[in-house]
Amino acid sequence: MGERNFLIEGISGSGKTSVATMLENRGFDVIHGDRLLAYQGDPQTGVPVMPRPQDPAFVNAHHIWDVDQLKRLIDDQTHPRTFFCGASRNRHHFAQWFDAIFLLETDWATISRRLDGRPGEWGDDPRERSLIQQLHISRIDLPIGAIAIDATRPLHEVVDAILARC
């Protein structure tokens, strides 16, 4: 999709979708990876697995992106810059395709407040919320070596900070 491609990652509630929407509103090419590319699969092989919606840890551990579809999008250089927003557990298969990876960093109070503001979505269920809090503390699913962006700031400042590094 872009001559240069950027991945914006973060834990649930860190602001990925809000950042993506603001980038779109500013005229940038954006792929909502969790909407377009995500499915439940084995993070090593990509083989689809039977979803287990009642098991948040399983859902999280098997939330992966379609690597072949992602590669097609990255190879299409129609736009000067494309931003891919979302999270996946098979990032290790494609992280090297991005010019930079940004990590939206925020505190638990901010994440919790944001999750409260999106009823019916991931993180609304108490078991999901508990898992998100554990992941926030452990940082186990976060990309190592990513460019940290303080996502507690106003949204336009977060987006400006990302664009300043592109």
Predicted regions located by residue number:
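Hydrophobic anchor at the beta1->P-loop junction of P-loop NTPases
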Residues: 8
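Loop/turn-to-beta-strand initiation segments
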Residues: 78-83
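Walker A/P-loop
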Residues: 17
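Conserved substrate/cofactor phosphate-moiety recognition/catalytic segment
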Residues: 21-68
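P-loop (Walker A) phosphate-binding loop of NTP-binding proteins
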Residues: 11
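Small-molecule kinase domains that catalyze NTP-dependent phosphoryl transfer to phosphate-bearing small molecules
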Residues: 91, 119-162
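Conserved phosphate-donor/acceptor-positioning beta-strand/loop module used by diverse small-molecule
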Residues: 97-117
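ATP-binding Walker
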Residues: 14
